[in-house]
Amino acid sequence: MASIFSRIVAGEIPSYKIAEDEHYYAFLDINPVAPGHTLVIPKHEVDYIFDLDDEEYAGLMAFAKRVAAAIKEAMPCVKVGVTVLGLEVPHAHVHLVPLQKETDMNFFRQKLTLPAFVRIALYLN
């Protein structure tokens, strides 16, 4: 069965797309730790990020770097934090989080409302 992220890439589940190319896809996290929290995934489904071959891994990180630069330009933040957790969805992914302070990487926060998602997605696009 396809992961939820593969279903997002296939268009079966809606997302707030931030960036896309032939191999990678970036979209707003539905349970963000900060406004602009974005997930970056390979379109090719692989559960564990370190199971990606070297070329795919390097491509994913280069794509994430470009997305992080766009987030940094569009969102008020000091830096864009990056983390890989990988336990919640069996599809390799990178979290990009606009940061004001280290505690902004707290992954136990309240969910955003639909209007907030729309506003942030429009701002980042």
Language-model-detected regions and their locations in the chain:
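HIT superfamily nucleotide-processing domains
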Residues: M1-N125
